[in-house]
Amino acid sequence: MMSSSKETAKSLIQTKSRSSIRNMFDEVAPTYDFLNHLLSLGIDNYWRVVAAKKARKQLEGEREPKILDVATGTGDLAASMAKIPGAKVTGYDLSPEMLAIARKKYPNIEFLEGFAEKMPFDDRSFHVVSAGFGVRNFEDLAQGMKEFHRVLKPGGCAYIIEPMIPRNAVMKKLYLIYFKNVLPKIAGMFSKSTFAYDYLPNSVEQFPQAEAFTKILKNAGFKKAEYFPMTFETSILYVAMK
């Protein structure tokens, strides 16, 4: 069973097909919030707050800022962004099961279903685009970032949170032991979709980090892109300005 799970995860890493990613998140939706908070020891909420605080500072003076949260999942980052005064937030995700939970949790936020690489929004529609722990799952990362850029207003910013593999050798070793050996076993106790938690560490390892990802953002058209490691470099916030 474990071998099959790991093989499924490796296959998903290689293809990143939209339908497979959607099916995976549909499967994990019932336990997603519980496991996210458990496996991150609750620190994931802090990371969202950091992103929302930076967005709030950017939006000072905007009376009705429009915010798009892509790969919104069950809506937690969208909800953090919705605390910004006057904000109108739209959550957007490919998984109908995740969105069903988001709508129950946050009935005052609009949630729409679709793919990030081709979004149904007009050019220059949003002051902020955010994404928490989702862009590494895009089938076409470069195209997804071009869409982020397209729908942002001039001067608008993208705020993207992703897991990070620590650069410190000791922290990196401990992190990978936890991610690859401990995390999947804990997840397997609560979730039927064990391959999703074999997929997670592999997807983080495959994702371009720090300078490599800011280069992708600049290639997508952003005039400025920077990053902020958080919590001993276990997570990272990217901020890109159009």
UniProtKB/Swiss-Prot annotation:
Which segments does the entry list as coiled coil? none
What are the GO MF terms of this UniProt record? Answer: demethylmenaquinone methyltransferase activity
- The EC number(s) given in the record are 2.1.1.163
The record's Gene3D superfamilies line, in alphabetical order, gives: Vaccinia Virus protein VP39
The similarity comment for this entry is:
Belongs to the class I-like SAM-binding methyltransferase superfamily. MenG/UbiE family.
- The residues that the entry says bind S-adenosyl-L-methionine are T74, D93
Q: Which reaction does it catalyse?
A: a 2-demethylmenaquinol + S-adenosyl-L-methionine = a menaquinol + S-adenosyl-L-homocysteine + H(+)
- Signal peptide position in this chain? none
Function, as annotated, reads: Methyltransferase required for the conversion of demethylmenaquinol (DMKH2) to menaquinol (MKH2).
Organism annotation: Chlorobaculum tepidum (strain ATCC 49652 / DSM 12025 / NBRC 103806 / TLS)
Q: In which pathway does it act?
A: Quinol/quinone metabolism; menaquinone biosynthesis; menaquinol from 1,4-dihydroxy-2-naphthoate: step 2/2
Q: What is this protein called?
A: Demethylmenaquinone methyltransferase
The alphabetical list of record keywords is:
Menaquinone biosynthesis, Methyltransferase, S-adenosyl-L-methionine, Transferase
